[in-house]
Design a protein with these regions (language model features):
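Structured, basic alpha/beta domains of bacterial-type, RNA-associated proteins
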Residues: 2-30, 36-41, 45-130
Length: 130
């Protein structure tokens, strides 16, 4: 392995050791725009407050996001961090694949339907580290 690549690999390893808890959700069947509205509500909040806020949201993306936060919290507690001090440091919502379908219309025509998906990444930190 070249020296520069070795340094990059070592830097990634050190960064992984310093992480508190991460989780990612791939191919959520909703558009990124709709999921970002819910993600913006909980960004930067304490984890327990985020659970409460998501429990009372009527949007469809709130339940998968709540499960994702639960997974990230479980990853953090597995690494030995206290779940009461966890904060949502970063939450990113990316566009996923778009499945293209067609709906038949009048006079032999067809109109396209775009079924969008979303990828969500969450990184937690402790309240003390901020």
């Amino acid at each position: 392995m070249a020296t520069r690549e070795k340094q990059k690999a070592l830097a990634r390893k050190v960064a992984r050791e310093l992480e508190v808890g991460t989780a990612s959700l791939k191919k959520l069947k909703t558009s990124a725009r709709k999921a970002r509205v819910v993600a913006n509500l909980v960004r930067g909040q304490l984890l327990s407050d985020a659970y409460v806020n998501l429990a009372f949201q009527k949007r469809a993306a709130s339940e998968p996001l709540r499960a994702l936060l639960k997974s990230a919290a479980a990853n953090a507690t597995e690494r030995g961090f206290d779940a009461d001090n966890l904060i949502i440091e970063e939450i990113q919502v990316h566009k996923g694949e778009i499945a293209r379908r067609f709906m038949p219309r009048a006079q032999g025509r067809a109109t396209p339907i775009r079924k969008q998906s979303t990828h969500i990444d969450v990184r937690l930190s402790t309240r003390d580290s901020k």
